Amino acid sequence: KYTVTSYNPLYEALNLISIKSYITTNIDNIVPLVMSNSKRYYLRDISHGPVKKSNTEIQFIPLHGYVTDLNSHLYFGKNELANVDSDNKDLFDAMHDKILNYPTLFIGYGFHDNSVDRVIANTITNPKQDIWVMCLENQTAEINYYRQLGCKIIIGDTNSFLQWVNETFTQKEKHVQTDPLNIVLNEYKIPDACNVELIPKEQYFQKCRTDWYCIFYNYPYVRKHVDDIREKLLSTKNIIVKGIPFSGKTTIAMQVAIRASNNYKLFINELTVERANYIINVLSNKQALIFVDNCCEDAEALSILMKCANLSVIGFTDDFVYESTKHKFDNIKISFINVTELESDEPYRIYEQIPESIRLQFSKVEQDEKCSMVEFINQNVRDSLSEDNVKELFSRIKDVSIKGFEVVALATYLSKNGSALNTDVLCSYFDTTDYSVIKRYISIAQNCLREMSVILEEDLADQDYYLLRSHVFVYLSIKVLMRHYKTEYQKIVKRLILNVSPYKIYRYNVFKRSAYDSSFFNKLFGNDADLLYQHL
């Protein structure tokens, strides 16, 4: 009933102005439909977690629900609307934050919703940014009222406003707007060898850091799967490469990527449905090769790319994740390549790549025996990441600062489940709004991790986010926390669940699938797991 399939073309004018967030009390899909065809923006529903700073991603905050979201409750009646700010507190808090920190335009909003008006009244009386309100010409009382509050006034209706934007900004945007294709290519491009961070070869093997520098300078052995994938690409457009965790899939993805000669090639780590549609819009009908790491974290998004005739797609995933999502690909022709454990002469070939200064005596793999990459590195590389030295590290961090210990434990829990540590999570977790306190805790954690050459670094795209680059460290940390610091880990995970809004957890839609896994929860919390599930 409230879903539309077409719209007034004047709405395309929204693509001409700079937008950071779209907040609405409407439940229809007009603006989302407009943005689904855009080459400048795409909407990202806040229920999926916060949005990193981006010139293309707009945070979408549907205060009363959203008609195309099957999990969204739609608010209609007087009684429901009277309490919607309580039911959707996180959405209203997000609205409050946006109005405080960015100039805001109220367009087509009648100020008849008490729940919304309470938040607006609080921000309008103490504005940090300009607030613009569009009123009809005959709304004299409203115009005078909002002017007295310090708001800027626009006289007109939605139609005339969009027409004005279209007439005013079209020519200007032609001169100043960056080509959307260049934006996409820059965001997802494979970097040049001369523009990547130098990683010593010893660190690659000891700390299991898979970075572009290591690939360009041939640190890892090139396994047969690289040629298998390249050959498969000659006869098929869609490939999924799957295998056990830590079997070298990401390394293989990067090795194939630097060898590909396609004019347009993209390497994507965090694919979403909205991002997939945006990339298709921008590429238009151009032929492109797209690599998607951890591709089954959003299988629907991957299927959208694979169905696009002009795109060749290679996805890389853990086999158990693929098995839980494979129904999403029922009607798509896909070739599969399985990345096996090390076999035959591969262990010795990899051993030859290890710098002599950190080589242990070669631990031979018997003819019929297989081993994982992690096992091989532990057996053949001096001072490599191991459960024992990660345990020692956590012991030292705890002695230095319990807050630093909690930061590292949080970072590993979030990273393990497809998310990332950010300052908003830490502020809620530690119940503080003092960013200097949070920065101090992060600095303590970083300094302790640096002792093992493990990096917790600011995300270059958004400095409110902190990334753990070593997946092996994350994996070993979870094992150590579960085995040796279970009581502390229980408290940390429980506090995260109780204190931190899902809307502050990056990629929450991905995070929640594994972070609250029943097997993990029962091991960690025992009989108390059900109480936490009730809260969730």
Question: What role is predicted for each listed range?
Answer:
Residues 195-227, 231, 236-238, 245, ...:
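Winged-helix-like regulatory helical subdomains adjacent to P-loop NTPase cores
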Residues 239-265, 277-284, 308, 319-329:
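P-loop NTPase Walker A phosphate-binding motif
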Residues 357-401, 452-456, 465, 474:
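Loop-to-helix "switch" segment enriched in basic
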Residues 419-536:
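C-terminal leucine-rich, beta-strand-based interaction scaffolds used for sensing/assembly
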